[in-house]
């Protein structure tokens, strides 16, 4: 299977934006979220990674808009951002998205997270936002503002609960165009049977080709954001590169 590419649409107040290292206030705006998503669909995307940054940072939500975007797309959507209780999860699933990503909730409310994994199976993935500090792999929560514990311990727990998929971000790379952390991706994929989706740092077609070499180890897809918006390459070029 070729590497699956998921163009990212990060939403703040209804607009598509990109952040640098996930920091609020570092946004660059790229127009309406719906237009951005439809554009990626037109360019051949099979998946869209749709993120409610307002909900992730706990400052409101774009729930109605996200439901509208999912409804107008013909491709699969992975929905993320601020999904941390029954209400927000139900609303996310009600949009008709293919799956949701739990982030902070997996760290702050492990019992709830385990229950959602058991109830919803393949429809729930867990986002692991990793910061490597002094050689230690720490998880970050609440829009990367809080410490969420040791990556390997949390991964072992989630695996034992049957988590179906992980979205792995190196926080120091995201939105920086600094290249993906291949060592981290291979490390996570090597410790779990569940597929892994790479996120953060992709800056070139060579970066995507490098991630694509990990498909045999369990890396199934890559989320691409800033590089596409900054015009480093087009989505059709990227799709060709990972299928070579």
Curated annotation (Swiss-Prot):
One of its GO terms (molecular function) is phosphoribosylanthranilate isomerase activity. Its main location: cytoplasm. Keywords: Amino-acid biosynthesis, Aromatic amino acid biosynthesis, Cytoplasm, Histidine biosynthesis, Isomerase, Tryptophan biosynthesis. GO terms for cellular component: cytoplasm. GO terms for biological process: L-histidine biosynthetic process; L-tryptophan biosynthetic process. It comes from the Bacteria. Its EC number is 5.3.1.16, 5.3.1.24. Belongs to the HisA/HisF family. HAMAP family: HisA (MF_01014). This is Phosphoribosyl isomerase A. It comes from Mycobacterium ulcerans (strain Agy99).
């Amino acid at each position: 299977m070729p590497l699956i590419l998921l163009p990212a649409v990060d939403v703040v107040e209804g607009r598509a934006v990109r952040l640098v290292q996930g920091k609020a206030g570092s946004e660059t705006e790229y127009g309406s979220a719906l237009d951005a998503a439809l554009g990626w669909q037109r360019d051949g995307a099979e998946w869209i990674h749709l993120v409610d940054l307002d909900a992730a940072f706990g400052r409101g939500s774009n729930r109605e808009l996200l439901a509208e975007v999912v409804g107008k797309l013909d491709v699969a959507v992975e929905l993320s951002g601020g999904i941390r209780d029954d209400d927000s999860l139900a609303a996310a699933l009600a949009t008709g998205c293919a799956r949701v990503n739990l982030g902070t909730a997996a760290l702050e409310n492990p019992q709830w997270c385990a229950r959602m994994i058991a109830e919803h199976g393949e429809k729930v993935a867990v986002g692991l936002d990793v910061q490597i500090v002094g050689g230690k792999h720490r998880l970050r929560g609440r829009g990367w503002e809080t410490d969420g514990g040791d990556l390997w311990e949390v991964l072992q727990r989630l695996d034992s609960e049957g988590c179906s998929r992980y979205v792995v971000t190196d926080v120091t790379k995201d939105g920086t165009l600094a290249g993906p952390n291949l060592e981290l991706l291979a490390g996570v994929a090597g410790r779990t049977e569940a597929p892994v989706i790479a996120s953060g740092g992709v800056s070139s077609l060579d970066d995507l080709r490098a991630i694509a070499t990990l498909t045999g180890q369990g890396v199934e897809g890559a989320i691409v954001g800033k590089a596409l918006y900054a015009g480093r390459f087009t989505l059709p070029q990227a799709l060709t590169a990972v299928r070579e």
